[in-house]
Amino acid sequence: MSTMTVLRLMLETLTSRLHAAISRVCEADMTPLAETGELLRIMQIMQREAIGSEHDREGDKDAKRRRLRRLREKIARLREHNEHPVGNSHEAAYQANARIKTDDVALAMIDDALKGL
């Protein structure tokens, strides 16, 4: 499977989670909007990586591994930064938890892809 295919599958998974979060916004509770924003943030990072992977050769597992590890490092740095909420309100804590949860999902997907290489 090419790097582009792996990243595309990850984006499709995140897109389905995004769709589910948006459909929950119609409820009285608007908190899924935070999750929606976080999913979009991670999807944008993955999309940039997918654009860069278009020139990778089809069978080049080393390039795929390097690209996925670099992506994992970026998201891990973001997750570490998100562990420190800005502000003392409940909303700040909720935002930080939403970011961490989304980062953890992305990291797990990347780890699964790396195990398959």
Roles of regions detected by a PLM:
Residues M1-T5, G52-K61, V86, A108-L117:
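Short intrinsically disordered terminal tails
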Residues T3, L7-I22, D60-R79:
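Short amphipathic alpha-helical heptad-repeat segments
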Residues D29-E54:
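Amphipathic alpha-helical protein-protein interaction segments
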